[in-house]
């Protein structure tokens, strides 16, 4: 089962969503309070399972309404996804993937793991 690992960093507090194997599948922005971070986790739990995928790498792609996963190519030419909440705010983002199929698998992993993932504190 996946978990949301909450971690304090120099500039605030953030979370990583980890799959059952411990691999980070999505990360948050840095929040200035634990309460805000926990709200972000709840937003991912609520939005990930219902969010459609907007593949911005496809020619003439269909624009989806928020909440949604956006698939895009970064400056390094790698595929990434970000999960946007209903208000359009980015609530989770991925690392870069060399293959689009791997990126899409990452989205499926977030959809599967987020709803029931436990929250744990990390050093």
Predicted regions and their residues:
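A structural feature that tracks compact, well-ordered secondary-structure segments
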Residues: 3-31, 40-44, 68-98, 102-110
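Short amphipathic alpha-helical linker/capping segments at the junctions of internal repeats
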Residues: 33-36, 56-60, 99-102
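Intrinsic disorder/low-complexity detector
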Residues: 1-10, 46-75, 119-122
């Amino acid at each position: 089962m996946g978990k949301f690992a909450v971690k304090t960093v120099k500039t605030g507090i953030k979370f990583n969503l980890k799959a059952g194997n411990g691999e980070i599948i999505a990360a948050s922005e840095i929040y200035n309070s634990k309460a805000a971070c926990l709200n972000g986790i709840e937003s991912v739990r609520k939005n990930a399972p219902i969010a459609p995928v907007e593949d911005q790498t496809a020619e003439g792609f269909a624009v989806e309404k928020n909440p949604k996963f956006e698939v895009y190519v970064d400056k390094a030419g790698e595929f990434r996804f970000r999960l946007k909440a209903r208000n359009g705010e980015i609530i989770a983002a991925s690392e870069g993937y060399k293959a689009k199929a791997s990126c899409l698998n990452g989205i499926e992993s977030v959809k599967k793991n987020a709803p029931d993932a436990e929250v744990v504190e990390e050093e």
